[in-house]
């Protein structure tokens, strides 16, 4: 999967299209990511020891990895490629050519 935790991404599809935020969690088995402040859903929480009152909480839900593009340091969104630099495999932005790792 080309997106990692901590990457700055731009959402390119869906109700939050155009939003730029940081990846909180990458879920490679299901090809999804959880992005900060994107795809907020309301969850009905049952009372527990940590939250004795229960209630409705808002949290980020996962979105498909194809709906985000990784941003480089200059804020250019592009597809991600892989190349070898000094014998080490690194990710790079195909549009700007800048190394991401």
From Swiss-Prot:
Pfam families in alphabetical order: KOW, ribosomal_L24
SMART domains: KOW (SM00739)
Source domain of life: Bacteria
Keywords: Ribonucleoprotein, Ribosomal protein, RNA-binding, rRNA-binding
InterPro entries: KOW, Rib_uL2_dom2, Ribosomal_uL24, Ribosomal_uL24_CS, Ribosomal_uL24_KOW, Translation_prot_SH3-like_sf
Key word NAD present: no
Entry GO terms, CC: ribonucleoprotein complex; ribosome
GO molecular function list: rRNA binding; structural constituent of ribosome
GO terms (BP aspect): translation
NCBIfam families, A to Z: rplX_bact (TIGR01079)
HAMAP family noted in UniProt: Ribosomal_uL24_B
Family membership noted in the UniProt record: Belongs to the universal ribosomal protein uL24 family.
Purpose of the protein: One of two assembly initiator proteins, it binds directly to the 5'-end of the 23S rRNA, where it nucleates assembly of the 50S subunit. One of the proteins that surrounds the polypeptide exit tunnel on the outside of the subunit.
Protein name as annotated: Large ribosomal subunit protein uL24
């Amino acid at each position: 999967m080309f997106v990692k935790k901590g990457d700055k991404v731009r959402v390119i599809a869906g109700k939050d299209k155009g939003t730029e935020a940081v990846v909180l969690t990458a879920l490679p088995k299901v090809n999804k990511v959880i992005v900060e402040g994107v795809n907020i859903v309301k969850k009905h929480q049952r009372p527990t020891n940590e939250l004795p009152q229960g209630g409705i909480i808002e949290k980020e839900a996962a979105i498909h990895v194809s709906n985000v593009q990784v941003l480089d340091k200059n804020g250019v969104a592009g597809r991600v490629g892989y190349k070898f630099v000094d014998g080490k495999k690194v990710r790079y932005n195909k549009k700007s050519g800048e190394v991401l790792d």
